[in-house]
């Protein structure tokens, strides 16, 4: 359900929105704002996913050392 919301914008963003509408890329100022909010939502979703991954890593404890030679030797032994 849509609702009208009043937002105060400075001259920079007002000019930017006007240019997007006048250039034909968007039909209305609301279209421009919705596009910007979709991008912000996508960005915030990615940031949250990264934060969640970092939290999982942090909670998993200290990393174990990795020896590539031992790993390769084990893979050759197991898989020929």
Curated annotation (Swiss-Prot):
Origin superkingdom: Bacteria
Family: Belongs to the ParD antitoxin family.
Keywords associated with the record: Toxin-antitoxin system
Native species: Xylella fastidiosa (strain 9a5c)
Cystine crosslinks: none
Pfam families xrefs: ParD_antitoxin
Keyword Transmembrane attributed: no
Protein name per Swiss-Prot or TrEMBL: Antitoxin ParD
Entry-linked InterPro entries: ParD (IPR022789), ParD_sf (IPR038296), Ribbon_hlx_hlx (IPR010985)
Record keyword Zinc present: no
GO biological process terms held by the UniProt record: regulation of DNA-templated transcription
Role according to the record: Antitoxin component of a type II toxin-antitoxin (TA) system. Neutralizes the effect of toxin ParE.
């Amino acid at each position: 359900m849509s609702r009208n919301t009043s937002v105060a914008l400075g001259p920079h963003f007002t000019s930017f929105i006007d240019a997007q509408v006048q250039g034909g890329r968007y039909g209305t100022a609301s279209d421009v704002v919705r596009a910007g909010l979709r991008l912000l939502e996508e960005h915030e979703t990615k940031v949250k996913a990264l934060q969640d991954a970092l939290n999982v890593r942090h909670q998993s404890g200290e990393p174990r050392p990795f020896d590539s030679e031992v790993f390769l030797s084990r893979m050759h032994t197991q898989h020929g």
